[in-house]
From Swiss-Prot:
The gene is leuB. Its cofactor is Mg(2+); Mn(2+). It comes from Archaeoglobus fulgidus (strain ATCC 49558 / DSM 4304 / JCM 9628 / NBRC 100126 / VC-16). Keywords: Amino-acid biosynthesis, Branched-chain amino acid biosynthesis, Cytoplasm, Leucine biosynthesis, Magnesium, Manganese, Metal-binding, NAD, Oxidoreductase. The record marks Y119, K165 as: Important for catalysis. This is 3-isopropylmalate dehydrogenase. InterPro entries: IsoCit/isopropylmalate_DH_CS, IsoPropMal-DH-like_dom, LEU3_arc.
Amino acid sequence: MKKIVVIPGDGIGKEVMEAAMLILEKLDLPFEYSYYDAGDEALEKYGKALPDETLEACRKSDAVLFGAAGETAADVIVRLRRELGTFANVRPAKAIEGIECLYPGLDIVVVRENTECLYMGFEFGFGDVTEAIRVITREASERIARYAFELAKREGRKKVTALHKANVMKKTCGLFRDVCREVAKDYPEIQYNDYYIDAACMYLVMDPFRFDVIVTTNMFGDIVSDLAAGLVGGLGLAPSANVGERTAIFEPVHGAAFDIAGKGIANPTAMILTACMMLRHFGYVEEAKKVEEAVEKTIKEGKKTPDLGGNLKTMEFANEVASLLD
């Protein structure tokens, strides 16, 4: 029995989580769900955006399924990533038939190192001068590179591309690039190459089909994964996972969207696909495929939420997907 902590959070997080839970409960898998608070409402209610009770439950869980948070998002999700040691942020960018996008048929994955780089928060100010310390270690670089190659191997993908800026940041990016090249030697069946981050952004816009799995450092990965999402329809359709040695956090990329919260029109696609990533994580690959195919079939038939030009409400869309799982 897998213990899943469910955190709906703020805004549309509650609505899209309800949709995803409808799908998960329909599958009737050996999961034990427990609901906890985190986010803006939790801050107002408990004085903490991430209450101690929630954090403790997350530490004991096999996975966390997270909806969305508002202004306190960084206090919740960034801290959770750190506390749970989720070193890999996995962000697929896959075009869905029936949704207009720049590159139909595109299917790539961005694997982002989640624990170091400039996002460690080592920033200092001296009058009119500020500075930040960038930390890149061999251990974290090897761990994320190996994760990217193992993901490629597991999913039958053929290529891993590392992104860096070693021509300028010779020590930090140089170490990351060199470690990726070393790890690549252990996977001769998988193609490897690397690009400077600026050139890679150009290639992503002009010819994204040259990529398959992208692995990169924390800040570059944050930026490039949003770019990749834009190629296939935007952040509203993008799922993600934060994976550690012992547990994982699964969250849609979109935020709380307070402007549409409570109207019942939020698109739950990203949240449902995020739940599918959790299913795959636990080895329920066929179940995940079944849900993904149901989502794609629903959208292809023109049954969409308003943001995609349709007229279905959040739970109406979820029910359409669920009906295909019978």
